[in-house]
Design a protein with these regions (language model features):
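Short amphipathic, positively biased membrane-proximal segments
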Residues: 1-313
Length: 313
């Protein structure tokens, strides 16, 4: 069969990978099967506990708390960029380019470990469907690292063609890992700020929450401020604190969390926020919690979202 005769079959295969109006396509269907598969579930608990043996302050840094967003997407640029650049240089003639490609591969191998460590730290505080995809994502990237390490070794021994072949295989595998990472971030919303929509949906009108006398002292209750579900805490001093109820990390219900030292601790993954300003004093949350202004009129507690924090447009 001539190659031209195979083109329709190749095109049909490619089209089957893409989503259609009435079905997701093979790629998405495969990833969704990974989400639902329980085959690797016995590994999830031990791996999570191993990650949680790291000191909390170190985990906060690895999560990206100082940045205000996950650190993993930042660090993965180093190995991915290095390896992709090396692949381009491998296609160009010249001894200097071969040496530069080897140096880039070495840089990618050296920076893969910190990128992976931030990824594992984030992974340990996800939901099971996310953890399943994340585990395959990590395996793909680990395989790519092994291939690139082999590629570097072959190059150092003068076996350039073998080094290029291993590098190409590594680039293919790390691209699969990257695609799964994109699914994790954009389809499954891992690493996203789950309280970001509050600033867009909340209005700045005053809304009645409850009578002050009906609010228990030192215990969180759930209420509504317009379309936003909030947690309300009446302190012993009489001050009323109102925060968005859904945790910025993974949308856990803060109103069911523990109150201690002027903070609330999320019942799902332990993110801790100050009641007075919503600051995330401890991760895994990397973003603070939206806070509402409050006032008491004739014994009635009212709340509104601050005008300066409102986001629209």
């Amino acid at each position: 069969m001539a190659f031209s005769d195979k083109i329709p079959d190749v095109a049909a295969t490619f089209r089957s990978l893409l989503p259609e109006p009435d079905r997701p396509g093979r790629v998405l269907a495969t990833v969704e099967r990974i989400e639902a598969s329980q085959a690797a579930d016995p590994l999830l608990g031990p791996l999570r506990r191993a990650v949680h043996t790291l000191p909390p302050d170190l985990r906060d840094i690895l999560h990206g708390k100082p940045l205000g967003h996950p650190a993993h997407p930042v660090l993965v640029q180093l190995p991915m960029g290095s390896w992709t650049s090396a692949a381009v240089l491998d296609m160009l003639p010249g001894k200097g380019k071969r040496r530069a490609a080897g140096l880039l591969i070495a840089l990618g191998v050296a920076t893969a470990a910190p990128a992976a460590l931030t990824g594992w730290t984030d992974w340990a505080d996800l939901r099971k469907p996310q953890m399943r995809v994340g585990l395959v994502h990590a395996l793909a990237n680990s395989g790519a690292l092994a291939l690139y390490t082999t590629s570097l070794w072959k190059r150092l021994r003068g076996r350039r063609m073998a080094g290029r072949a291993y590098g190409l295989a590594g680039l293919t595998l790390v691209s699969v890992g990257g695609a799964l990472g994109g699914h994790l971030a954009y389809r499954q919303a891992s690493g996203a700020n789950h309280a970001e929509q509050v600033a867009a949906l909340a209005d700045t009108e005053w809304h009645a929450i409850a009578m002050l006398s009906d609010l228990p002292v030192g215990r969180a209750v759930r209420a509504e401020v317009g379309d936003i579900t909030v947690m309300v805490v009446r302190e012993a001093s009489g001050t009323v604190r109102v925060l968005a109820d859904r945790c910025s990390h993974m949308a856990g219900p803060l109103s069911e969390g523990e109150l201690e030292n002027g903070c609330v601790r999320c019942p799902w993954h332990g993110s801790t926020f100050r009641l007075d300003d919503g600051w995330n004093v401890q991760g895994p949350a990397t973003a603070p919690q939206p806070v509402f202004e409050t006032r008491v009129i004739d014994g009635r507690v009212e709340a509104r979202f601050p005008e300066h924090a409102r986001k629209n447009g």
